[in-house]
């Protein structure tokens, strides 16, 4: 396929509203001399004050990223635990003490910079000796940083009851996220980003785009996936992120992230329920699944599979290590419409409500209507989980999947040891926000109930697409990644 034909195809699909670019990507396409199209990054801190990847270098790296509105995931597991004597008369203060510095950096740079919408997430492995201190840190000690525990099945099995209890309570109160420890095709560890949907090498960056399923007919899905992946890979070769001196080059960081939004809209437009779609997914994915499948639902599932396969083929032919990521996309979804003219719902989950009033100190009150989609309350936890597990299974089978910013529903589920065990053996890669989804239990501090720009950072939504706006509100956390 020639370049001119691809350009025409890109234009047609954009006009047809089926490719949803992040604000950063669109701005960079319009003006390559503007901010970089990548949105978040990762830094793995070595156990040394000095050196190219030491603690002081991490401060510079975090400062650089935040000043340009990016999100930074800071991985602290290599730092010695508090109280460790290095044999030269120096005693380590531990990773938690440095966590306060990253929080302070974020607070001050957001108050004084131009782009006040970066975010910091601190990561610590479950088997680190200071894990209890990390999990139990009061919010007021690190008010401008989130916390994520990285773990494996073995780590969880070996954790003490006291540690497990602290983590489960932290998840329930919204303080702690989880990310599975992940390795690339060569066995090298890769690290979760801010929103937990992308896994990177240290100093890697993420370049994201979405297929607007709500703008597609089933027969459009394959073309949308192919075009989205082709465009991302073309952009990947041109970003020039390594020129900053802080980030990996494209040759060393061969990954992009194509995701989805508007699934709820597509299902509603095709007259398919989430339950019918979940049965069709199971029927398609598992040979021994015995379901009475709705033809319209199976048609969407097969189109989705063909689209993923086509995009995976393009990514593999361009030597990409990873190529799919389902990000939190509330802000991006607000900018796009479905085939009926309604606002597209974020990512692949059912929305909490059909109507959203976004009260923004910058733009005033904006009203959004998702149309006649099913809501989370109507879909229910079991069906939601079956759908998102099924889609993640599709992506995982390509061996090119980063992950999904997977939200749990705190007013529906109970966070127990067994709940974590089930998550660990599922295709999910992270456990992001714990949301209240039932209409009669939503609270002001529900991270996804509304994107209110006056939220304290502790309760604000980290959504990959808000980085494209210059914000002038002191404590507005628009997001991090995408």
Task: List each model region and its residues.
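Long, C-terminal-biased catalytic regions of enzyme "large/alpha" subunits
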Residues: 1-482
């Amino acid at each position: 396929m020639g370049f001119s034909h691809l350009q025409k195809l890109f234009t047609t699909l954009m006009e047809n509203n089926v490719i949803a670019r992040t604000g950063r990507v669109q701005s960079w396409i319009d003006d390559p001399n503007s901010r970089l199209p990548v949105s978040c990054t990762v830094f793995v801190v070595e156990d040394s004050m000095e050196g190219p990847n030491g603690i002081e270098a991490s401060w510079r790296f975090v400062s650089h990223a935040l000043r340009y509105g990016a999100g930074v995931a800071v991985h602290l597991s290599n730092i010695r635990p508090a109280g460790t004597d290095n044999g030269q008369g120096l005693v380590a203060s531990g990773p938690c003490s440095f966590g306060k510095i990253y929080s302070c950096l974020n607070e001050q740079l957001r108050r004084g910079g131009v782009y006040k919408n970066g975010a910091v997430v601190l990561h610590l492995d479950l088997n680190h000796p200071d894990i209890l201190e990390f999990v139990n840190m009061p919010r007021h000690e690190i008010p401008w940083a989130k916390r994520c525990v990285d773990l494996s099945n073995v780590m969880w099995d070996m954790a003490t009851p006291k540690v497990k209890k602290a983590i489960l309570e932290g998840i329930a109160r919204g303080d702690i996220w989880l990310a599975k420890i992940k390795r690339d095709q060569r066995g090298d560890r890769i690290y979760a980003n801010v929103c937990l949907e992308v896994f990177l090498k240290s100093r890697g960056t993420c370049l994201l785009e979405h297929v607007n399923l709500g703008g597609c007919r089933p027969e459009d899905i394959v073309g949308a996936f192919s075009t989205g992946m082709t465009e991302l890979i073309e952009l990947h070769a041109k970003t020039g992120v390594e020129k900053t001196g802080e980030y990996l080059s494209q040759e060393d960081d061969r990954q992009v992230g194509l995701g989805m939004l508007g699934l709820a809209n597509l299902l509603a437009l095709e007259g398919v329920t989430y339950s019918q779609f979940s049965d069709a997914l199971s029927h398609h994915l598992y040979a021994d699944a015995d379901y009475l499948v709705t033809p319209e639902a199976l048609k969407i599932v097969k189109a989705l599979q063909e689209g993923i396969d086509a995009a995976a083929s393009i990514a593999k032919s361009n030597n990409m290590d990873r190529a799919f990521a389902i990000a939190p996309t509330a802000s991006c979804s607000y900018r796009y419409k479905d085939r009926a003219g309604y606002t597209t719902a974020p990512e692949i989950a059912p929305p909490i409500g059909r109507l959203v009033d976004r009260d923004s100190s910058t733009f005033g009150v904006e009203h959004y209507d998702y149309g006649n989609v099913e809501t989370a309350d109507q879909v229910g936890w079991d069906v939601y989980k079956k759908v998102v597990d099924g889609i993640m299974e599709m992506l995982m089978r390509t061996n090119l999947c980063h992950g999904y910013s997977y939200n749990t529903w705190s007013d529906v589920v109970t966070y127990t040891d067994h709940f974590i065990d089930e998550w660990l053996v599922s295709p999910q890669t992270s456990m992001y926000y714990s949301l209240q989804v039932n209409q009669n239990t939503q609270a002001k501090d529900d991270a996804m109930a509304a994107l209110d720009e006056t939220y304290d950072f502790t309760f604000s939504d980290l959504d990959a697409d808000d980085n494209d706006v210059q914000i002038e509100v002191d404590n507005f956390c628009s997001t991090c990644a995408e």
